[in-house]
């Protein structure tokens, strides 16, 4: 499976199921790559998979693709020392890969079960951008016969908030789309804030769509709970202390980074994500359980060991 086939397979996975997270599509692609690999050593297989992850990150530069790929590689590689026979070892690696994929496919439902209980009847919720996990949580709240209304930022520059508003309208949830600049104005009207995350970093902070940080700052200033919902495959080995510490490969789209290599100035581009400090986050709802920001590092160590 060469790089062109790898990229085409990845894109076809996303096209088949637009609701699928890009990280899940990447893991499915890596599993298919593992099945088709013709290498003869474990070391060579690991090197090929690492190269494949880098190729996928070049197509989709989101944090989740990077962390999901790395966790997948670690999870399937645990058996590599137990078997001396390569074919048997590869078979076990494929089986473990399928287990990993099944496990992460159930993540959103687990998170929804945990989080929707925090939504009280009559709640006014503020959210940001389009998050499939947040949508699943709100679907669970609707299924539990809870009445609530949602304010959502339009989320420039791609107006993904309007996509979220449309999805919520299908659930018959009252939705109001507000300007990104109106977050401070609307905050006094809401009871809680729920956002997704593109990545959860080692100190319990998050990397998410640009505008999340200002929402968290406003929520903290007005004593509103700020909840984050994210799957565990988004836990990434990164320890930013401020916005400048977030690597450019996560801040900008892959196409933008390629254009920079041809001489375009990155300072003229707008970042797509920002970093939100753990001190601004109330709780994180993950498929590993409900975590405080300080507990994230313990879980991250367990995942990556």
UniProtKB/Swiss-Prot annotation:
GO MF entry, a single one: guanyl-nucleotide exchange factor activity
GO cellular component term, pick one: cytosol
Gene3D superfamilies: Translation initiation factor eif-2b, domain 2 (3.40.50.10470), Translation initiation factor eIF-2B, N-terminal domain (1.20.120.1070)
Primary location group: cytoplasm
One Pfam family hit: IF-2B
Domain of life where this protein originates: Eukaryota
Keywords: Cytoplasm, Initiation factor, Protein biosynthesis
Compartment(s): Cytoplasm, Cytosol
Regulation: Activated by the chemical integrated stress response (ISR) inhibitor ISRIB which stimulates guanine nucleotide exchange factor activity for both phosphorylated and unphosphorylated eIF2.
UniProt cross-references to InterPro entries, sorted A to Z: eIF2B_alpha/beta/delta, elF-2B_alpha_N, IF-2B-related, IF_2B-like_C, NagB/RpiA_transferase-like
Annotated GO biological process: cytoplasmic translational initiation; translational initiation
Assembly, per entry: Component of the translation initiation factor 2B (eIF2B) complex which is a heterodecamer of two sets of five different subunits: alpha, beta, gamma, delta and epsilon. Subunits alpha, beta and delta comprise a regulatory subcomplex and subunits epsilon and gamma comprise a catalytic subcomplex. Within the complex, the hexameric regulatory complex resides at the center, with the two heterodimeric catalytic subcomplexes bound on opposite sides.
Family assignment from sequence similarity: Belongs to the eIF-2B alpha/beta/delta subunits family.
PANTHER family, alphabetized: TRANSLATION INITIATION FACTOR EIF-2B SUBUNIT ALPHA
Function: Acts as a component of the translation initiation factor 2B (eIF2B) complex, which catalyzes the exchange of GDP for GTP on eukaryotic initiation factor 2 (eIF2) gamma subunit. Its guanine nucleotide exchange factor activity is repressed when bound to eIF2 complex phosphorylated on the alpha subunit, thereby limiting the amount of methionyl-initiator methionine tRNA available to the ribosome and consequently global translation is repressed.
Protein name: Translation initiation factor eIF2B subunit alpha
